[in-house]
Amino acid sequence: MPRSRINGNFIDKTSSIVANILLRIIPTTSGEKEAFTYYRDGMSAQSEGNYAEALQNYYEAMRLEIDPYDRSYILYNIGLIHTSNGEHTKALEYYFRALERNPFLPQAFNNMAVICHYRGEQAIRQGDSEIAEAWSDQAAEYWKQAIALTPGNYIEAHNWLKITRRFE
């Protein structure tokens, strides 16, 4: 039974019903419908913290999905899981891949900036100010891109850029 049919709460059930109706009425190929089903099941598993199951669904969705824009969101969600698991190098790889297909994902730029900022903080704790500065500069570049795409969002990042004199 697809995961979408076993969701427990009202909102999940409603979303699943709407998604199933859309899948029936929107003219798509069976492969696209199957890819969307795997993607939807991946999001459901991810929201429940079942990351291994979510990854399986996302990888299957990637195998079937041909649209670059849709693939960007699958890749982004895979990046989120790797971020949650502390696998920052893998997460960055998936965020990059998502942005190659869709350069208008401010959340990917933000998450990349957060990882770089975290690595900069780690370098400071280890006493390596040169490496810390490089990571912080990279974080600044990613945050600038996120802010440029969605002005008014990422207020804390905007303030950090001003405080550290990295905002142009």
Curated annotation (Swiss-Prot):
Short name of any one Pfam family annotated for the protein: TPR_1
Ranges in a coiled coil: none
TPR repeat ranges, renumbered to this chain: 35-68, 72-105, 120-153
Signal peptide: none
GO cellular component entries: chloroplast thylakoid membrane
Tree of life domain: Eukaryota
Gene3D superfamilies in the record: Tetratricopeptide repeat domain
Gene Ontology BP terms: photosynthesis
SMART domains: TPR (SM00028)
The entry's keywords: Chloroplast, Membrane, Photosynthesis, Plastid, Repeat, Thylakoid, TPR repeat
Topology in the lipid bilayer: Peripheral membrane protein
Protein localization: Plastid, Chloroplast thylakoid membrane
Annotated family: Belongs to the Ycf3 family.
Stored NCBIfam families: PRK02603.1 (NF002725)
Function text: Essential for the assembly of the photosystem I (PSI) complex. May act as a chaperone-like factor to guide the assembly of the PSI subunits.
Protein name, entry field: Photosystem I assembly protein Ycf3
Organism whose genome encodes this protein: Drimys granadensis
